[in-house]
Amino acid sequence: MPRSRINGNFLDKTFSIVANILLRIIPTTSGEKEAFTYYRDRMSAQSEGNYAEALQNYYEAMRLEIDPYDRSYILYNIGLIHTSNGEHMKALEYYFRALERNPFLPQAFNNMAVICHYRGEQAIQQGDSEIAGAWFDQAAEYWKQALALTPGNYIEAHNWLKITGRFD
């Protein structure tokens, strides 16, 4: 039985019911339906903290999904899992790949900035201010891109840019 059918969460059940109805009434190919099933199962696994299973479902959804916009969100979510697992360089790779398919993902730019800022903080702790500065500069560039797409969001990032003199 697919994971999405056995999840006890009310919202997940509601989403699954609505999604199943939509899949019946909207013309879709069998491949699109199968890709969506993997995507839905991934959401269920990820919400339960089962990242390994979520990744497997994402990779299967990527194999089946052909729409670049939908693929961008799958790639973004793979990046989220790698971020949660502390695999920052892998996460950055997936955020980049998501943005190649959909350059209007401010959350991907924000997450990339957060990773770069974190790496800058690590460099400071290791006493390497030059490397820290490079990471912080890169974080600033990503936050500027996120803010350009969604003015008014990411207030903390906006304030950090102003305080550090990186806001043009």
Curated annotation (Swiss-Prot):
Subcellular localization(s) per the UniProt record: Plastid membrane
Chain positions of TPR repeats: 35-68, 72-105, 120-153
Entry keyword annotation includes Repeat: yes
Gene Ontology terms describing biological process: photosynthesis
A GO CC annotation given for this chain: plastid membrane
Membrane topology (UniProt): Peripheral membrane protein
PROSITE patterns recorded: TPR, TPR_REGION
UniProt keyword Zinc present: no
Swiss-Prot/TrEMBL keywords: Membrane, Photosynthesis, Plastid, Repeat, TPR repeat
HAMAP family the UniProt entry points to: Ycf3
PANTHER family per UniProt: CELLULOSE SYNTHASE OPERON PROTEIN C, TPR REPEAT-CONTAINING PROTEIN MJ0263
Biological role: Essential for the assembly of the photosystem I (PSI) complex. May act as a chaperone-like factor to guide the assembly of the PSI subunits.
Family, as annotated: Belongs to the Ycf3 family.
Name of the protein in question: Photosystem I assembly protein Ycf3
Organism: Cuscuta reflexa
